[in-house]
Amino acid sequence: MEHVMIRRLEHLTGSAAAPTLGFGVETRDRPGPLHKQGAFQDDVAWIQLHGGLFVARAAVRICWVGEYSDVASVRARTRGAPIHDLDEFWRGRPRYGYAGVATLARETWLDSPFWAGPRTYGYEWVVLESDAKRRSWLEPKDPPRGGTVLLDEFRVWRGGQA
């Protein structure tokens, strides 16, 4: 199975050589795609920046899904990864609800980032459970109006990482 993990540029972590996302996280006030369908060992997770630019891919090592009564309990599952310490990433999330936390491995930047996918409507995780959905999300397309700014910002961000 393949998945798309959507993250804002300011929540990206890693070096110029490789991403170090560590975890894919979905928290919602109602069950979302990751909570409903899960992710399993060796599933592919594509990393898309909010705005439509695909920049990396990883493999799922293990995934936890469940209900939570305090978002701090979800955050605790990411301890040791850079995302754990990004307060901005955790701010504004539902205080209680449904979550999925996928541990990522074999993270790599794409040699050529590409634009793809429909609007995300606030989702952080999408499961590509059919060929049609996979095509809809992964077939390259032209950047959106003003989208080249995101590509430039990503290149600057990645170039500035040690």
Regions found by a protein language model. Name each.
Residues 1-41, 48-51, 108-162:
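Compositionally biased, charged N-terminal/linker segments
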Residues 30, 45, 87-89:
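Sparse, context-dependent recognition of short Cys/His-centered cofactor- or disulfide-binding micro-motifs
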Residues 41-43, 100:
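Short beta-strand or tight-loop elements
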Residues 54-55, 59-138:
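Aromatic- and Lys/Arg-enriched surface recognition patch
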